[in-house]
Amino acid sequence: MKITAEMIKDLRQKTHAGMNECHKALQQTEGNIEKAIVFLREKGIIKAAQKQGRVTSEGITNIVFAGNNAFLYEINSETDFVSKNEHFQQLVKMLGEIILKKQLSNVKDLLAFNYQNKTVQELLFEKTSVLGENITLKRVLKVTKKPQESFGIYKHQGGRISVLVVLKNDCPSVSEDIAMHIAASKPQFLTPDKVDPTFLAEEKKILHKQAAKELSDKPAQMIEKIIENRLGKMLKDMCLSEQPFVKNADQKVKDYLKANNTDVVYYVRWEMGN
């Protein structure tokens, strides 16, 4: 029997299941809507569909890499308990293998990818049914380095925070230390000259407004000096190169890197849920 778009639409409205699931259910039941509903219930798909809108505020970030390419990805669940479940952990590993093998660098392509006769979206749907919580893929990012550069990776609390660093050369111990520093210190920019001009202009505007209230009795030249000092202190806290190194507070990160004849080309810090 031919399965029409109208039949699929009708079943979707009744069950809130996905289009592919509805199409398969109708094929299995020769177009019988009532039997298709029973089929979806038996597969646990209707329950999973009902969970799809629920908030996923827990989960795991992870990093996989091979050669010159690395990928960060985040998978979410509703509770921390489920994110530690063996089924969830297996899903994280499986998605990492798919991402790396097929070099998939965005959520849309990954969800649509067919793995063992099922799309990744359908696999997530199945896990939602098994685990009893909404399971979602939040984001994917690809980072490519030059052949002479190296990756450094650090994961905190089993993937609640994941950091990827690209160094200009191969320094395994340094890359791990810097990745750990970034996880702890949360720098927003690599160096002062890499600060987003729009962000800088906005911060200066805020500092000027604050100074106008606090320092109205001071000369304009002094106010400008105070603003520049405050801005400098803020950038010191926000720029990786200017931060005190987490393993030696007397040494700036840039000095630690210089002492080891290397430098950070790029970094990314992901925190679960952010």
From Swiss-Prot:
It is found in: Cytoplasm. Gene3D superfamilies: 1.10.286.20, DNA helicase RuvA subunit, C-terminal domain, Elongation factor Ts, dimerisation domain. Residues 79-82 are annotated as: Involved in Mg(2+) ion dislocation from EF-Tu. GO terms for cellular component: cytoplasm. InterPro entries: EF-Ts_dimer_sf (IPR036402), Transl_elong_EFTs/EF1B (IPR001816), Transl_elong_EFTs/EF1B_dimer (IPR014039), Transl_elong_Ts_CS (IPR018101), UBA-like_sf (IPR009060). The keyword Repressor does not apply. The keyword Cytoplasm applies. Signal peptide: none annotated. Keywords: Cytoplasm, Elongation factor, Protein biosynthesis. GO terms for molecular function: translation elongation factor activity. Belongs to the EF-Ts family. PANTHER family: ELONGATION FACTOR TS, ELONGATION FACTOR TS, MITOCHONDRIAL. Associates with the EF-Tu.GDP complex and induces the exchange of GDP to GTP. It remains bound to the aminoacyl-tRNA.EF-Tu.GTP complex up to the GTP hydrolysis stage on the ribosome. This is Elongation factor Ts. It comes from Aster yellows witches'-broom phytoplasma (strain AYWB). The gene is tsf.
